[in-house]
């Protein structure tokens, strides 16, 4: 198993206790709510897991095995739920031209054959996803910003090649120059 597939992905945060049966509010941070199913376990740290005993997607409520009272449930308030990259690839289905963010991170951003930088992370602002790019060192030495944002959509993104870890863009140099 590769080092990357051992990485835990933050997919939700447990909210406040609701009612008398140990139910809790669920704040999903993922585009894949279908991964929250009865009987599925999630990490709360590298060594501890919680297993869902019930979920109500309409009300965004969850309940965990062994947490049957408000007092028990309150111990979990504000805990993050994590899953693995391996499980995400197995359980979550992508449409054509959709990518997991962890596959985008680390890609080179290239315009007109020139590497502008490396994708450090993605950030969602409103309905648009942005590539947070760490600028190539040679460009930084030439006076450009150390990092910049590129909208991850047309017309800026021409091609995304996950296997080669290259995202071909247009207009990103203009964005970098204005940063």
Curated annotation (Swiss-Prot):
It is found in: Cytoplasm. The keyword Cytoplasm applies. GO terms for molecular function: ribosome binding. One of its GO terms (biological process) is ribosomal small subunit biogenesis. Transmembrane segments: none annotated. It comes from the Bacteria. Coiled coil: none annotated. The keyword Cytoplasm applies. Keywords: Chaperone, Cytoplasm, Ribosome biogenesis, rRNA processing. Signal peptide: none annotated. HAMAP family: Ribosome_mat_RimM (MF_00014). NCBIfam families: 16S_RimM. Binds ribosomal protein uS19. The PRC barrel domain binds ribosomal protein uS19. An accessory protein needed during the final step in the assembly of 30S ribosomal subunit, possibly for assembly of the head region. Essential for efficient processing of 16S rRNA. May be needed both before and after RbfA during the maturation of 16S rRNA. It has affinity for free ribosomal 30S subunits but not for 70S ribosomes. This is Ribosome maturation factor RimM. It comes from Sulfurimonas denitrificans (strain ATCC 33889 / DSM 1251) (Thiomicrospira denitrificans (strain ATCC 33889 / DSM 1251)).
């Amino acid at each position: 198993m590769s080092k990357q597939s051992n990485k835990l992905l933050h997919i939700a945060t447990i909210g406040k206790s609701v009612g008398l049966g140990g139910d809790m509010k669920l704040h999903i941070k993922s585009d894949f709510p279908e991964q929250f199913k009865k009987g599925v376990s999630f990490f709360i740290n590298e060594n501890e897991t919680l297993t869902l005993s019930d979920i109500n997607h309409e009300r965004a409520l969850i309940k965990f095995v062994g947490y049957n009272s408000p007092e028990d449930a309150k111990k979990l308030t504000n805990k993050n739920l994590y899953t693995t990259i391996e499980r995400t690839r197995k359980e979550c289905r992508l449409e054509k031209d959709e990518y997991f963010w962890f596959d985008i991170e680390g890609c080179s951003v290239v315009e007109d054959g020139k590497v502008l930088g490396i994708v450090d992370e993605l950030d969602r602002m409103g309905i648009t996803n942005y590539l947070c790019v760490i600028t190539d060192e040679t460009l930084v030495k030439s006076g450009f910003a150390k990092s910049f944002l590129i909208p991850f959509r047309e017309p800026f993104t021409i091609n995304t090649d996950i296997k080669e870890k290259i995202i071909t863009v247009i207009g990103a140099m203009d964005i970098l120059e204005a940063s």
